[in-house]
């Protein structure tokens, strides 16, 4: 997994000089960081690309919380995921939040990562949505889609995941099943910047408005991914 050199800082400084305080910059999704398999599978999607509402597209935003650079912060209330950058900035991604995602909050770490992971429906999903196959191979037809980042706490799997989606039209919404869904493009982008051991702060319900709260949520500790590079 390659990390890329910061270049947006130069652009950001220019914008500050020309237009005053910059607070929110749209960061268009690109194929930067895609591998050969990504390009092949993403060119043959079994669903139509969705028109994601502008607030839920990838942005670089001001961030005044105290989590360390390299930390992932999930604000389920407002359907945003933040990847904290240096100098009071963060990448903000729109997400869809499933019932499983509402059932857990706290501090976790990325314990496992997988490209185009298989999907193994949980007992709850089988009960709500079944009958479902016991195992679905990886690919764009799979609800996990492009990437899976599996969260662990105390060395144990929380069963909480950050992953892609084959239903991008639901980004920005609460949905009936799943954990934290991102567009496949955004899931690939985040995957290329985190690593096993990256700290993930999942805000408790009604503890949202993440970028504007100065406190460290839930006793968050500095991320192990403290050296952060960007495009």
Please identify what each model-predicted range represents.
Residues 62, 71-75, 80-84, 92-94, ...:
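Soluble periplasmic/extracytoplasmic beta-strand elements of cell-envelope proteins
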Residues 54-80, 89-97, 129-136, 164, ...:
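N-terminal post-signal-peptidase region of extra-cytosolic proteins
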Residues 27-29, 75, 153:
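Acidic/polar residues at beta-strand termini and the immediately following turn/coil
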Residues 78-79, 83-143:
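Mid-length scaffold segments of soluble, non-membrane domains
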Residues 15-42:
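Bacterial Sec signal peptide processing site at the extreme N-terminus
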Residues 1-21:
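Sec-dependent bacterial lipoprotein signal peptides
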Residues 101-102, 106, 125-231:
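Exported/periplasmic cell-wall-interacting domains
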Residues 40-61:
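Short, basic/low-complexity N-terminal boundary segments at the transition from targeting/disordered tails
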